[in-house]
Curated annotation (Swiss-Prot):
It comes from the Bacteria. The gene is rplM. GO terms for cellular component: cytosolic large ribosomal subunit. This is Large ribosomal subunit protein uL13. Pfam families: Ribosomal_L13 (PF00572). It comes from Nitratidesulfovibrio vulgaris (strain ATCC 29579 / DSM 644 / CCUG 34227 / NCIMB 8303 / VKM B-1760 / Hildenborough). Belongs to the universal ribosomal protein uL13 family. The keyword Ribosomal protein applies. Part of the 50S ribosomal subunit. GO terms for biological process: negative regulation of translation; translation.
Amino acid sequence: MKTFSPTPENINREWFVVDAEDKILGRLATQIAHRLRGKHKPEFAPHMDNGDFIVVVNCEKIKVTGKKLDQKKYYNHSGYVGGLRETSLEKLLASKPEEVLLKAVRGMLPRNRLGRAMLTKLKVYRGTEHPHAAQKPTPLELTY
């Protein structure tokens, strides 16, 4: 018997919608990253992008444990001397809640061209409305 190696024609991608309300950030991000990579499928191959599309709604209602709202910091640099900016999780959740989940999942994906392609299959929205109704995403109840 030969080992099955998937080809781009064999990849079957599905659309799922996840409600992030009252879910813990890290636990939700790990399961999303797992599905984006396609590791839940028997035909997983580490050199191919065979994961599913994930639509996350209610990202502004995500929870964190402990004192992370005050203590967790996000850094970005402008490229100029002294241009390091620091933002707390609390401020980022208030202004751009989509970025919080995107940054958490990005850190769990491969740091190469394949990881960037996987991240494009993640769609994060505030509220319950999303523009992907035509794809008929099935609700996905993630368990921890």
